[in-house]
Amino acid sequence: APETFAICLSFSINFNKIMNIAIVGATGNVGRKILEVLEKKELAIDNLYLLASSRSAGSKINFNGNEHEVIDLETFDFSKVKITFFAAGGKISENFAEIAAKHSLVIDNSSFYRMDPDVPLIVPQVNSDHLNNIKKNIIANPNCSTAQLVIALKPLHDLFKIKRIVVSTYQSVSGGGKAPMDELIEQTKQALEKNKIKSKNFTKQIAFNAIPHIDVFADDGYTKEELKMTNETKKILDNDIDLTATCVRLPVLVSHSESVNIEFEKSFTLEKVREALNNFEGCKVVDERADGGYSTPLEAEGKDETFISRIREDKTVTNGLNMWIVSDNLLRGAALNAVEIAETLIKNNFYGK
């Protein structure tokens, strides 16, 4: 469990009084999931403000049995709230997060602030101690594929010290938003009906296919998604870890999967690996060496846990381990992690400087 610690902000917030929360991007995939998680967690929210673009303003969203009208982000007064969740992409965070952070604590799901040295990048079960000095009143949520990875790596790194990781991801289309999900369904229908397919949100046909390309290419041949995994894992867990990634988009609606090869500095036993994972908050081992004795994206959808399967030694390298990691990218990789950051702050009674 996360340690108890003092959290300092540049202004004072007292959570023992009124709890007002805003969600920027409330109509999107992650924004709606944040609402679901908040309902499930039963946090004592006094006033909830749902923010989106002017196109969505005026629409209604249900929360805890009550309808809430969506408000235009550009006209909102952030002094009304204590925590603001941003779930609307990097450009919106770039333009509005620092405005919100003048009055509230910002928890940002976009990539914009993740590598900012003055912004902590947080998975509460892994590095909540990094919350002890929040300089910009902004906390970053990691990339969805990184979040589930570091949850599984943390207990093993603590015991055996990780030297190097090779990870291949099998990522669902929901990582790109609602439009790619709708397109996968439409492309699947078109393919089954033998109709011509024209991709809108993908570089190639996604139905019945696999695309080894997520986000833009860098000069060295890696994609931005792959570089995110490398850089974010180092920032969250340990800068000395070497990590190389290949990220692939699959025709799956929800949940990301990862094939992970780890080289440790210390020797291990599979029994100790399983025990460490099972005892770590947020992890669940499903690893029977039999038909169906492993987790898949379908089983992970809607679940809070990160599931670890196919745990086995890599006998081609000293102290090598292989495993398969699956998690709901909209929950563990985004909404759930963001809400757990807020919970951690509330439990530790963060205060102003």
Question: What would you call each of these model-derived segments?
Answer:
Residues 14-16:
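Intrinsic-disorder-associated, low-complexity terminal segments enriched in Asp/Asn/His/Tyr and depleted
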Residues 84, 173-353:
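Charged docking surfaces used in two-component/phosphorelay signaling
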Residues 18-206, 242, 306-307, 311-317, ...:
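N-terminal Rossmann-like NAD(P) cofactor-binding subdomain of oxidoreductases
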